[in-house]
Amino acid sequence: MRAVTWQGPRRVETQDVPDPSLAEDTDAIVQVSATAICGSDLHLYEVLAPYLTRGDILGHEAMGTVVEAGGAVTRVRPGDCVVIPFNIACGACWMCARGLQSQCEVTQVRAQGKGATLFGYTSLYGSVPGGQAEYVRVPHADYGLIPVPQGGPDERWLYLSDILPTAWQAARYADVTPGDTVAVVGLGPVGHLAARCALRQGAERVIGVDLVPERLQRAREAGIEVVGDTDDTPAAVLELTGGRGADRVIESVGMEAHGDPVVAGMLGVVSRLPKPVSVPLAENAAVDRLSAPPGRVRLGPPRWDGVDPGRVRRCGEPNQHDGTLRQAAHAAHGSGQRPPLERRTAADDRGGRRRLRHRAPRHPPAAP
């Protein structure tokens, strides 16, 4: 089969590799119909080279059709259309039962001191071959695969693999309630969807903050108010809200970007959040999504929620059966470009770490 492989820092190639096969009776093989480049993939492109081996298959956002299933797999069968979540979990351990699938005790990479195994994401997370390929082996398939309806564009469901549950969860952690004004800092793929999820969860107004004109325009088209290039973002948000500020703030700039200055500005946007509260939060709560605290800092009404790998939920129980989330998947489809798998390298070179702006679904070439 053809697959996108890591060959060194800033070097990926589409190569011929062996087809995957069942390794356990709980596995399934999925023929990939669409996959996507995630912002996390760009960490592999440059930063996480020490944890990759030449030839590793990349990708952790994919969907397709089940073509083979192990004897213990009963929930899906060949011919089913499925989405493959980023994290690999058993669904039955203590962590999974509490919605912390990315800390699954069965697939946890204990030797590395990390959480559950992840598709296409370095030796730190199990070196599991990823989904930017024509076929992928899915462990714990009964729990890991999300059946979706046949027909329609893949992009209608593809984002359920990672980005949409992440955005939905951010809005949930912000405790968005009807009538709220929500500020979203960073309108990249996750931030854009988090803003739209906040609207679907009842926010009366959502104000998005970014510097990229294309992102601001896409947000406007989705009914999101925007704040662009300004010397004083908190002042701009305060002006839009009559001096009251936002009720909830979602920070989605990510670990590559501006760091503490953005977070400091974000804290200043929150309604009535005094410096004696905001400064200790900024000093003691990490903001990188790979190091944010799994707990919650609570000082009276203001609260900082950390979203680290231990709290990032899959689109599964309880979210898998959340009809509103599935409705959001319908609303999210259709964005980004759709080059074939063979053009993955060019897409990375064109995007770069600081220029990637939109999701990019990938479609393996049609069979002859």
Language model features with spans:
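Glycine-rich cofactor phosphate-binding loops and adjacent beta1-alpha1 units
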Residues: 174, 217-330
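Residue-level recognition of short, solvent-exposed, well-ordered loop/turn junctions
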Residues: 23-25, 77, 177, 244, ...
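C-terminal hydrophobic helical "lid"/dimerization subdomain
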Residues: 1, 294-298, 338-368
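Cysteine-cluster motifs in flexible loop/terminal segments that predominantly coordinate metals
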Residues: 38, 86-150
